A protein has these predicted regions:
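Cytochrome P450 core scaffold surrounding the K-helix E-X-X-R motif
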Residues: 47-48, 78-83
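Short alpha-helix boundary/capping segments
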Residues: 8-11, 29, 56-61, 94-104
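Alpha-helical interface subdomain recognition
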Residues: 66-71, 82-87, 91-204
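Flexible, small-/acidic-enriched active-site or ligand-binding loops
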Residues: 42-73
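A short core secondary-structure module
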Residues: 2-49
Length: 204
């Protein structure tokens, strides 16, 4: 088969792929059909067919690859966990992964707010700084509030995951996964607007 969006596969240092695929198609439960295994990049039949760009950027040197697996064979010792345990392993990793990614998004929003504040106090129009024009101070204040709310939700998700385990944390992780990305998109968009044309250039 083929897999797209294999992040980091284009890096020369990438020696192994962590592959999840169906190994038990006859299992009664769909969640028991997948397994996870290590596949060396130099295994016969493993081919990078193309690198995928994102908005025109190739994200070199790591990049995102499309990989073809043609009759690839590996030893049973490359299996991670047990046969059919792949979905369980992946789900266990995704909980902490989602918390991590949301915290990174909060960091990006924090940086965007920092730039927004700097721009609003250093750029003058009509004899006044931008912070004193058109309700911009409200935009900044709302961004600060939304970041703090999202941060608390992420911290709650992390605490619940650490203290009570994944199953108890699933609900708050799901909430966080909705709230945090939307917050980050809103704050970053406001920062772009505050910078005008500069906001979509490499200067910012």
């Amino acid at each position: 088969g083929e897999k797209s969006w294999v992040s980091g596969a284009g890096d020369a240092r990438c020696k192994f792929l962590v592959v999840m695929c169906i190994t038990k198609p006859g299992a009664n439960l769909a969640a028991d059909r997948q397994s996870i295994m290590l596949v060396p990049m130099d295994t016969e039949g493993v081919t990078i067919t193309r690198m995928i760009s994102v908005f025109g950027y190739d994200d070199a040197p790591q990049g995102h690859a499309q990989i073809k697996f043609d009759n690839v064979q590996i030893p049973i010792t490359n299996l991670i966990g047990k046969d059919g345990q792949g979905f369980e392993i992946a789900q266990g990793r995704m909980g902490s992964g989602r918390i991590h990614q949301c915290m990174r998004s909060i960091g990006a929003a924090e940086r965007a707010l920092e730039l927004m504040v700097k721009r609003s106090t250093s750029r003058f129009a009509f004899g006044k700084p931008l912070s004193e024009l058109g309700g911009n101070v409200d935009v900044i204040a709302n961004s600060r509030i939304e970041i703090e709310m999202s941060r608390l939700m992420a911290l709650k998700a992390a605490w619940t995951f650490e203290d009570q385990g994944l199953l108890q944390a699933l609900n708050v992780i799901a909430q966080m996964k909705v709230v945090v990305p939307n917050m980050a998109l809103n704050v970053i968009d406001r920062a772009i607007q505050m910078h005008g044309g500069t906001g979509v250039s490499e200067d910012t």
